[in-house]
A protein has these predicted regions:
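Domain-scale recognition of functional cores that engage charged ligands
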Residues: 1-178
């Protein structure tokens, strides 16, 4: 992104005009200095940015999972019972890692998975039973959620001995309001 320029409302990379950017950076909020030109182009509606900062904040920030997995808060917000049932069945219990819950979470770590608020693709995500004390110190420094561990499913894909088994996971996505 630091190689982009914005000239008269047109984002450019060298001489090439850019009108769509598929954002695979980890700076989804475009707050880092290297993203300044990209941020300005987005704010001027000079480009389509996917995901854009608002979409990322609404749909990808893992802190939202804390609310979406809390039955008391969902009820207090007036979320319909049928919607609550779907959310609570699909989203493992999630909480923010804080200094005041760090000791309890460390004791329960084998039942948890730790993920950064805004990470993606498994970057800096840790299964609790594999944590070292060094990594735990990074996690409790801030910016992580703890989520109930869901063991990945598996399928036998061969009749050979030993059978070949592959793990899989299911993910929830949203696109175009669906």
């Amino acid at each position: 992104p630091s190689e982009f320029t914005l000239h008269e409302g047109v984002l450019k990379h060298g001489k090439m005009n850019i009108d769509l950017v598929y954002n695979r950076l980890t700076d989804f909020s475009l707050s880092e200095p290297a993203s300044a030109t990209l941020r300005e182009a987005y704010l001027q509606n000079a480009i389509v940015l996917t995901p854009n900062p608002q979409a990322h904040a609404l749909f990808a920030d893992k802190r939202n999972l804390v609310l979406l997995s809390d039955p008391i808060r969902l009820q207090a917000l007036g979320v319909p019972k049928a919607t609550q049932d779907i959310l609570l069945a699909a989203i493992p219990h999630t909480e923010i890692v804080l200094p005041e819950n760090a000791e309890r979470l460390w004791q329960k770590r084998r039942e948890l998975f730790f993920k950064p608020f805004a990470g993606f693709g498994g970057r800096a995500a840790y299964r609790g039973d594999k944590l070292t004390k060094r990594v735990w110190q990074e996690i409790i420094a801030g910016g992580y959620i703890a989520q109930a561990l869901v063991i990945p499913g598996s399928r036998v894909i061969s009749d050979l001995e030993p059978a070949q088994v592959l793990k899989f996971d299911l993910r929830n996505y949203t696109y175009d309001d669906k």
